[in-house]
């Protein structure tokens, strides 16, 4: 399905990502963890082709994504949608119009200029908002929503592209614990119900363990861990974060206090929806 083959990104003398290799042979939810500057965001931006790799290849269904240009590159970016920490919404525009922006890559310039959308796209946008629990806010300006609601609007916009892969770059870093939980549950359900691959950069170990099928650890641009959530021990975490024996997971905790925190959310996301 998706293969990242020795992907490297250099900025001058600095190597941001160093020969990263990943194989994703079926839809799953992957969490990428590591310290700030480990190369997590750069890796996602290269996969989406927002940034070009210096070396290496990205293969999707045996097609070399790194060679795509023009319309083919834009089509890939729709197939591999990206969600950002800062939401990237148009604040003074209503929620449903922000969601409809997910269709811009397949609309004419004239239709874009005059905000002309097919009725079926409008209905689909509202259905997606309803699925994410925010259809009641469709007519509101995006700036009137909470951070968690805005991030769900960003997820809805990504879903309008009908992507095979969703890349989420620190999707909960700016959210309070309760909204962070809501957003992660939404991403988990999208994977489980739609069969989409979700790859999320995460800043907390407990979030990666709770919601992901697979965890990738990056340190200094290299992938130093790739395994199951239960294999992410404190010792492994120390290696990923470059910490000594005093390392405490509490420093990376989202502090979401739930009764079933000990259970992987990949087993219970549906029950908490």
UniProtKB/Swiss-Prot annotation:
Membrane topology classification: Peripheral membrane protein
Family annotation (Pfam families): ABC_tran
Binding sites annotated in the UniProt record for ATP: 34-41
Enzyme class: translocase
EC number: 7.3.2.2
Gene Ontology CC annotations of this record: plasma membrane
Chief localisation class: membrane
CDD domains per record: ABC_PhnC_transporter
Molecular function terms from GO: ABC-type phosphonate transporter activity; ATP binding; ATP hydrolysis activity
SUPFAM superfamilies: P-loop containing nucleoside triphosphate hydrolases (SSF52540)
Localization in the cell: Cell inner membrane
Domain ABC transporter positions: 2-245
UniProt KW Acyltransferase keyword: no
Alphabetical keyword list: ATP-binding, Cell inner membrane, Cell membrane, Membrane, Nucleotide-binding, Phosphonate transport, Translocase, Transport
Catalytic activity: phosphonate(out) + ATP + H2O = phosphonate(in) + ADP + phosphate + H(+)
PANTHER family: AMINO ACID IMPORT ATP-BINDING PROTEIN (PTHR43166), PHOSPHONATES IMPORT ATP-BINDING PROTEIN PHNC (PTHR43166:SF6)
Subunit (UniProt): The complex is composed of two ATP-binding proteins (PhnC), two transmembrane proteins (PhnE) and a solute-binding protein (PhnD).
Name of the protein described by the UniProt record: Phosphonates import ATP-binding protein PhnC
Organism whose genome encodes this protein: Ruegeria pomeroyi (strain ATCC 700808 / DSM 15171 / DSS-3) (Silicibacter pomeroyi)
Lineage: Bacteria, Pseudomonadati, Pseudomonadota, Alphaproteobacteria, Rhodobacterales
Gene: phnC
